Amino acid sequence: GQFVVWITTWVLVIKGVIPLWAGFIISTISTMNAYLPSHAGQHGHLSGKHKHLNWINPLVGQISLIPLSQSHEVLRATHMKHHAHTNDPEKDPDYYHTHVDGWLQAAIEVNKQTGDGRLAKMVEELAEDDPKFAESMQKGGNVSMLFLIANMIAAVTFPLETLLLWWLPRKIATSYLGIVFSHEPHKQLP
């Protein structure tokens, strides 16, 4: 549902049915909800007890993440490591944006996760210790590359629309998710 709203917003803005500013608001709200279906898929909840429907988890999870330009496989693998090593500064991929001084710092840190190299180093070490994690990161990396290419094509074709319907909503939504789903639940924990 959320992805349909997001992609429909693009079509309506490009066709001139709704103004870009309205599309920005709709896209931002839609993108803020993009992680929830993926999270359910990461835990296998979308298929539930029906193992023959396990394919639904990554399919719905990945489609829902298109507005966030994220790989479901990467987020699944890192999220499982987060559960396995919650609050461990050496092994919890969420540690650097959960253990900060406040919500604003959480919003900033979650948007620059790979900027200072700490997360990349942690992921590299986790991959060395866990071949399945390394495989997931490789598969997800390919999806991430497709998103990079798609973002560049969109930016060249529809520059202002890409800025206000994809890039900025993604940054706002990532900040929101970092605050609400990472920082707030973990801020009082050791």
Question: What residue spans do the PLM features occupy?
Answer:
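Short, surface-exposed linear patches
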Residues: 58-59, 87-90, 97, 174-176, ...
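Short, function-defining helix-loop hinge/capping sites that tune catalysis or transport
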Residues: 10, 47-48, 91, 182
